[in-house]
Design a protein with these regions (language model features):
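Mixed-charge, low-complexity intrinsically disordered segments
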Residues: 74-114
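Acidic surface patches and DE-rich sequence motifs
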Residues: 28, 59, 83, 121-123, ...
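Acidic, glycine-rich flexible loop segments
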Residues: 103-158
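Short, low-complexity, Pro/Ser/Thr/Gly-rich segments in the mature regions of secreted, periplasmic
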Residues: 155-168
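Bacterial Sec signal peptide processing site at the extreme N-terminus
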Residues: 14-34
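Sec-dependent bacterial lipoprotein signal peptides
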Residues: 1-18
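Short, surface-exposed linear segments at secondary-structure transitions and domain or protein termini
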Residues: 45-53, 72-85, 134-146, 167-168
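Post-signal-peptide N-terminal segment of Sec-exported extracytoplasmic proteins
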Residues: 35-73
């Protein structure tokens, strides 16, 4: 019986989409990196979709930033306000700068598929990352539907895109 447990668990994880690795591209939209021609596109990896996992990002100077991310708690019915209390940084303005005024409150805040991380670099740079997936698309396996934003301690703001499928 035990020899069948591992394949069954692996298949269940694959079918449910609860485990995977995605490559993320960080496009600078504001800050010092946008002054470079062409602006560098940073590449990172995120693991284990929206349950919790790790993030790794290599900055333009070669600095490696690593961190752990987890779901952002949904606000309780008694809480009021326009930002989540579960994040290290208030990223609502970053969402609105990239996706348009009111996007954060209308789409991201309170979403079931909303996660945040702080990645710390080997030279001390901090990168605050948030990702969100529209609930109407939450059961698909194509990572391109996920939206994300980031800002770093050097004054850069990034739009994050995912262009591949989550895989084991």
């Amino acid at each position: 019986m035990k020899k069948f447990a591992l394949p069954v668990v692996a298949i269940a994880l694959l079918v449910s989409g609860c485990y995977g690795v995605a490559t993320a591209r960080f496009y600078p939209v504001h800050g010092p990196l946008t002054q470079q021609a062409p602006a560098p596109v940073l590449v990172g990896t995120l693991t284990e979709t929206f349950n919790s996992g790790s993030i790794k990002l290599v900055l333009e100077n070669g600095e490696v930033c690593k961190g752990h991310w987890s779901p952002v708690p949904r606000p309780s019915r008694t809480e009021s306000g326009t930002t989540s209390k579960g994040t290290a940084e208030d990223m609502s303005a970053v969402w609105d700068e990239i996706y348009g005024s009111g996007f954060y409150v209308a789409r991201v805040l309170g979403s079931r598929r909303y996660a945040a991380a702080t990645a710390v670099g080997s030279h001390g740079t901090k990168v605050y990352v948030e990702i969100y997936e529209p609930e109407s698309e939450a059961h698909e396996t194509d990572a391109s539907r996920i939206r994300g934003v980031a800002k770093d301690s050097n004054g850069n703001i990034y739009k994050i895109t995912f262009q591949n499928r989550f895989v084991i």
